[in-house]
Amino acid sequence: MQLDWTFHFGLDVWLEAKRPTALRYHVRMGLHITDIAVSDFRNYERFALGELGNLTILVGRNGVGKTNLLEAVQLVTSAGSFRHPQIIQLIREGAENARIQMETTDGNRRITTALALEAGKRRYTVNGKAKAAADVRGTLPAVVFTPDDLQLAKKSSSVKRQALDELGAQLTRNYHVVLADYEKTLRYKNRLLKDEASRDLIAAIDETLVTCGSQLFCYRVALFTRMMPQLQRIYTDISNEGEAFAATYLPSWDHVAGIQPSLGGTAECLAGTPIEMRENGAPDRDQVRELLADSLARFAEEEARRHRSLLGPHNDKIAFYLAGRDASAFASQGQQRSIVLAWKLAEVEMVRQTLGANPVLLLDDVMSELDETRRDTLVNFASDDIQTFITATDLTAFNPTLLERARIIQL
């Protein structure tokens, strides 16, 4: 599949044109969730919330189902879940199917989006008309913050890549398509390597891998280079330490060859082999194709020896640095939390800048994990124009001023 490079930021006309006509206007104007109902979903037989405002706090003991409701919101708004479950896990034990229905409005008209889950299948409808998941994904992007995210600064590059890819998939449909194509091709290649297939067969698969891999690399790097200044600025605003923050993206063809990133003027962008960047902020795809193809040929014997694919965007490295030191090894717990908080707020900014509308913010039991300063930063950022859902076991970590403007639901 050959795609023109158009995933550059600021081309709102292109983003609108690629979105389904029935949903295009509403994304531009911004959507607000007014009602949500679930049946036979997770632990809920029936549950509904109506007349939802900008801030909803779900309070209850562990295991009561608070997180399940956030997951329901994300499944409908983003066509995905931060838990990455199998469909059978979403259906209440003893039931044959489950349903989530959400009402949204842009201020002029109401939209009903529903998700039916049964027998390993999921079916979306918008105002009663069947839609593919790709048509629903990103119509109301969701930014999710869970306790697991607090380890983002210390965890491996795979977690950081996944976070970028999940954001990118909500910003443009092409990102998700290219990512899915690449992952499918990669799985096939790894099976061939494991089965010790012929060099000619693997070389043929590498041609497809180069096509979709170079596209994914360009999409991800464009998003990374656009997001990093936001992340850097927000981290500086919320950090009390005054240390310089930087991030690097090191392509697989460099780190597999033993090339190390060098911090400098472009430390928040690409590290390693210089890559030409076009005016739209995208890497030169022809150069990326050439680099990836050459690297695959150069490391073909090593991949065959290890029985796994070493080269491609699935093995690119992303690292955070504080004062020039690797944050995964040297950052304090407080610094790690500041990095993750800055990352999540930068995600919100990217949705705003790219789609011209606010996301829905889903905060799963993170208020008690943050100190007062970071809680206030998060709450102040999630101002009245960002619809926010928060879960908590109790309200002790909440500012009284925040509680005054919240709808509190005891589960």
Model-identified regions with their sequence ranges:
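Conserved lysine of the Walker
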Residues: 66
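Long, charged N-terminal accessory/stalk domains
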Residues: 151-152, 158-203, 207-210
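Conserved NTPase motor "head" modules and their coupling/switch loops across ABC/AAA+ ATPases, GTPases
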Residues: 5, 20-61, 199-360, 369-373, ...
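Walker B catalytic acidic pair
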Residues: 364-366
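Nucleotide-state sensing region of NTPase/ATPase domains
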Residues: 74-159, 163-175, 228-236, 288, ...
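Structural recognition of the conserved hydrophobic beta-strand(s) that form the central parallel beta-sheet
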Residues: 387-393
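A short helix-turn-beta junction within AAA+ P-loop NTPase domains corresponding to the substrate/partner-engaging
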Residues: 402-411
